[in-house]
Design a protein with these regions (language model features):
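N-terminal membrane-sensor/transducer module of prokaryotic signaling receptors
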Residues: 1-117
Length: 117
C-alpha cells in the first residue's frame, strides 16, 4: 500500500462518520482514536519509523496523524452519544477535524518528498 492509499483510507473516515450519523449507529471510538490501527498508522509506526524516523519531517507527520485521530475520536464520541447534529457540524470545513486532516495531508506530502517516496 502506498502512502497516498493509506491517507485516502483516513480521509474515508469522514464518509464513514456521515453514514453512521445518517443510520444513527455507534462506532468503535477506541479503535478509531488509536494511531497504530489504520493503514497509515501501521506504516508510520512500522516501516516508516524503521526507515525514516531520522528525517525531520517524520515526527511532524506522526504528530499530525495523532492529532487527526484525536479529532476523529471526538467525532465518534458525539456520534455514540447520539449528538448527531454536533457530530455532523464537527465534520464541516474549517473545523478542528478538517484542519487536522489538512495538516496530516500536508505532513504526509512533506515526508514523502523528504523520503523520496
Amino acid at each position: 500500500m502506498t502512502l497516498d492509499e493509506a491517507i485516502a483510507k483516513d480521509q474515508e473516515l469522514k464518509s464513514k462518520f456521515l453514514t453512521a450519523i445518517a443510520a444513527q449507529v455507534k462506532l468503535d471510538a477506541a479503535a478509531i482514536a488509536k494511531v497504530d490501527v489504520c493503514d497509515l498508522g501501521k506504516w508510520l509506526y512500522g516501516e516508516g519509523e524503521r526507515k525514516y524516523k531520522f528525517l525531520k519531517s517524520y515526527k511532524p507527520c506522526a504528530d499530525a496523524h495523532a492529532t487527526f485521530h484525536q479529532q476523529a475520536g471526538k467525532v465518534v464520541r458525539e456520534i455514540n452519544g447520539r449528538e448527531f447534529a454536533d457530530a455532523e457540524a464537527m465534520l464541516a470545513d474549517n473545523t478542528a477535524y478538517s484542519k487536522a486532516f489538512g495538516a496530516l495531508d500536508a505532513a504526509v506530502k512533506t515526508l514523502k518528498k523528504d523520503a523520496k517516496l
